[in-house]
Regions:
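Alpha-helical scaffold elements adjacent to nucleotide-binding pockets in ATP/GTP-utilizing enzyme cores
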Residues: 129, 166, 191, 195, ...
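Long, basic/Gly/Ser/Thr-rich N-terminal segments
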Residues: 1-43, 49
Length: 311
């Protein structure tokens, strides 16, 4: 029985559940390494050590959090080398299926992928992106993927701060593509936007006059709108929605990045349009690196989070 229990608590390959089922088990686990061992393990890309370091950062115990901050400080020179992509969308849009499909495409490019979440309302039994891990089973089992649910308590600001720290540790561990998924459409989108390079908004076919209740501010942040579930029976609706969103985007002022946001259609379930979305992301990165916006935005984001940390 004990072996079975310990097995269920262990980190399962690429996915990680920040469990609180047995605090004693976790306390022993996260206190068993020195600062040097944590740093060396992370820099070698060891996912178990990475998970344990993230647990330190998320801990409610001061001594664990302090050690976690020391680990992060030691790892900082190895951060900043990833593409950070924010993904949001209305409930039911198929974010998990999309992340699974896009993630597999990215892994085929010999990249390493970390999937994080911001969901202040999540609980340990009802996690956000890991609420149904079966939707991302292939990613969970891939050696070059790491999936981490949202920190499970605290205000949006606190959750976001820990998510940013997790992002930096993932970069230090060699993950060069980071997805930050946010649940629902609300205040958390602004927070995600403040820590990513590219912001993707997923929508459903059949936008209608209300544009599915999406706030103008969320649409203005989007670098690309992708209408998911554009399949045989809904393809015409998806094309109509595409036109509506294109008309809406045309009313927005030019972006600081020099990029003109686009609208596309896809079917994550049928793996249609996924490659094209990745190509658009690459085009955006090429443009913004070339015109200097990429580095400028990274500096602005770092300054913002430094201010948030101090205050």
């Amino acid at each position: 029985m004990t072996n079975s229990r310990n097995k269920s608590l262990s980190i399962n390959k690429g996915s990680d559940v920040n469990d609180s089922i047995n605090p004693n088990y976790r306390s022993k686990r996260i206190a068993s390494k020195s600062l040097k061992e944590y740093v060396e393990g992370i820099l070698k890309g060891d996912r178990t050590t990475l998970s344990q370091a993230i647990t330190l950062i998320e801990s409610s115990k001061d001594e664990y959090r302090e050690l976690g901050q020391q680990v992060l400080e030691e790892c900082m020179p190895e951060t900043g080398n990833s593409v950070r992509i924010g993904i949001t969308g209305v409930p039911g849009v198929g974010k998990s299926t999309f992340i699974e499909a896009m993630g597999q495409h990215i892994l085929q490019q010999n990249r390493k992928l970390a999937v994080l979440a911001i969901d202040p309302s999540s609980s340990r039994s009802k996690g956000s992106i890991l609420g149904d891990k079966t939707r991302m089973q292939n990613l969970s089992n891939h050696d070059n993927a790491f999936i981490r649910p949202s920190p499970t308590s605290g205000t949006l600001g606190g959750v976001a701060q820990r998510t940013r720290e997790t992002l930096l540790l993932c970069e230090a561990a060699g993950f060069n593509t980071i997805f930050i998924e946010t649940v629902g459409v609300g205040q958390s989108e602004t927070t995600v936007h403040s820590m990513v390079d590219f912001f993707l908004l997923l929508m459903l076919p059949g936008a209608g006059d209300e544009l599915q209740g999406i706030k103008r501010g969320v649409m203005e942040m989007a670098d690309l709108i992708a209408i998911n579930k554009a399949e045989d029976e809904t393809n015409q609706m998806a094309q109509r929605a595409k036109k509506e969103y294109e008309n809406a985007l045309a009313l927005f002022p030019p972006t600081e990045s020099g990029w003109k946001p686009k609208v596309t259609t896809c079917s994550a379930l049928k793996n249609v349009g996924i490659t094209e979305i990745w190509d658009e992301i690459q085009s955006y990165l090429w443009l913004t690196r070339d015109n200097g916006y990429f580095d400028l935005r990274r500096k602005e984001q770092a300054a913002f989070w430094m201010h948030e940390t101090i205050h």
